[in-house]
Regions:
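A short amphipathic alpha-helical interaction element
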Residues: 45-48, 77, 121, 189-191
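Bacterial N-terminal signal peptides that target proteins for export
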Residues: 1-9
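Feature responds to low-complexity, polar/acidic, surface-exposed segments characteristic
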Residues: 4, 18-40, 55-74, 78-117, ...
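Bacterial N-terminal signal peptides
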Residues: 10-20
Length: 230
């Protein structure tokens, strides 16, 4: 009887090991987030999460097709550059650039301000208040447009000043017109030439369309590659 019990326990132990072994664990770890399997940017999102510059929502999803806000995008870029509140790199950025008090006074008491991302966004030069015309506050909770996201990306690449001096005789897409919506064709030219972003079609850019979290990860990943950090 005792021998039978021992054999039974042994079989149960072996079965348990098989069920919880590497094969099963691997299946449960195929994706960091529950909603990106098969997504166009799945591999890039996985890599970004592994590198520590993106995270998902409390429900375990990443929401790759959800529009990203201005400060969410700025935070993603700063984290990708290792400019994280409290880090040595962040301290160096804050010491090298004095953020005007009037700018800090515009920040609300939301998560980005409390955690220090707003100050870093301005200090790093990724966020420039003048981009928002007569706004007295940074409209950070609004979804960022494709055109504005391109400005952020070219700033992260370090080529924004260059874009201001470029002479673009013919816009790269036929839905780009010189108005309040698009006032710098140079950033789009630089972004497209370097593969940071592309048009929806060969002739349409849709500058006012929202920019998604998945697209944001893809763009930041491409900038990092150009900077030699990937």
């Amino acid at each position: 009887m005792n021998g039978w019990i021992v054999k039974t326990l042994g079989l149960l132990l072996i079965t348990s090991l098989l069920l919880t072994g590497p094969g099963v664990a691997k299946a449960s770890e195929t994706s960091t987030f529950s909603d990106i399997s098969g997504h166009k940017y799945e591999a890039l999102i996985e890599q970004a999460a592994e590198d520590g510059w993106v995270n998902g929502c409390p429900d375990g999803r990443f929401w790759p097709d959800r529009p990203i806000t201005r400060l969410e995008y700025a935070k993603m870029m700063l984290a990708a550059l290792n400019i994280v509140p409290g880090s040595q790199r962040a301290k160096e950025v804050l010491q090298s650039t004095e953020v005007p008090k009037e700018v800090l006074s515009l920040a609300d008491d939301g998560w980005a301000s409390k955690e220090g991302w707003v100050e870093l966004g301005f200090a790093s030069g990724l966020v420039v208040l003048g981009d928002y015309g007569s706004y007295l506050v940074l409209p950070h909770d609004e979804g960022i447009s494709r055109y504005e996201s391109t400005i952020f990306a070219v700033r992260m690449l370090g080529r924004f000043e260059e874009s201001l001096t470029m002479v673009v005789e013919e816009p790269p897409f036929d839905d780009l017109v010189p108005d309040m919506q698009v006032d710098n064709f140079g950033v789009i030219e630089i972004a497209v030439e370097n593969g940071l972003i592309s048009g929806y079609t060969e002739t349409k850019f849709y500058p006012a369309e929202s920019f998604t979290r998945g697209e944001a990860v893809a763009t930041v990943s491409r900038v990092l590659t150009l900077l030699g950090r990937n």
